[in-house]
Amino acid sequence: MLLLSSPFVSVSPPPPPLSSHGARPALRIEAARQLTGRVVTTKADKTVGVEVVRLAPHPKYKRRERIKKKYQAHDPDNQFKVGDVVELQPSRPISKTKHFLAIPLPPRDTRRKSQLLPPLQSDDDQEPSSRE
């Protein structure tokens, strides 16, 4: 028989058994991250470096400051150039550092115009009027 006389050795009771309805752990629901950033490097083949800027409060002064983080994203067609604005879509791990797909976004002003205004009648009439 083993004598447990040391103060450093303790015996804890076994964990309670799982019930039949609690056999699986609770599902963890997370919001999908929609990241938007600017392409800063295109040196590697099929990979772009994207810098994402977010605002976060300073721990001591509580003023919001810009936090920059750089992500590697998959660009299968090598279609992006430095300065392009892209959206990062989460995907399965493609390599050690690539966990996102780069998706093109239209320039900011064109996206806004198409959402706010209906097409003009002058835009519909592309042909010059020929009244003779």
Swiss-Prot record:
Quote the subcellular location field of this record.
Plastid, Chloroplast
What is the transit peptide's residue range?
1-31
Bias class Acidic residues marks the residues at 122-132
Compositionally biased region (Low complexity) = 1-11
According to the record, the signal peptide region is: none
Q: Which GO terms describe its biological process?
A: translation
**Database matches in InterPro entries:** NA-bd_OB-fold, Ribosomal_uS17, Ribosomal_uS17_bact/chlr
Keyword list (alphabetical) reads: Chloroplast, Plastid, Ribonucleoprotein, Ribosomal protein, RNA-binding, rRNA-binding, Transit peptide
Question: Where is it chiefly localized?
Answer: plastid
Q: Does the entry feature the keyword Plastid, yes or no?
A: yes
Q: Which GO terms describe its cellular component?
A: chloroplast; ribonucleoprotein complex; ribosome
Oligomeric state and interaction partners are given as: Part of the 30S ribosomal subunit.
Family statement = Belongs to the universal ribosomal protein uS17 family.
* Role, per record: One of the primary rRNA binding proteins, it binds specifically to the 5'-end of 16S ribosomal RNA.
Q: Which PANTHER family match?
A: 40S RIBOSOMAL PROTEIN S11 FAMILY MEMBER, SMALL RIBOSOMAL SUBUNIT PROTEIN US17C
Name of the protein: Small ribosomal subunit protein uS17c
What gene name does this entry carry?
RPS17
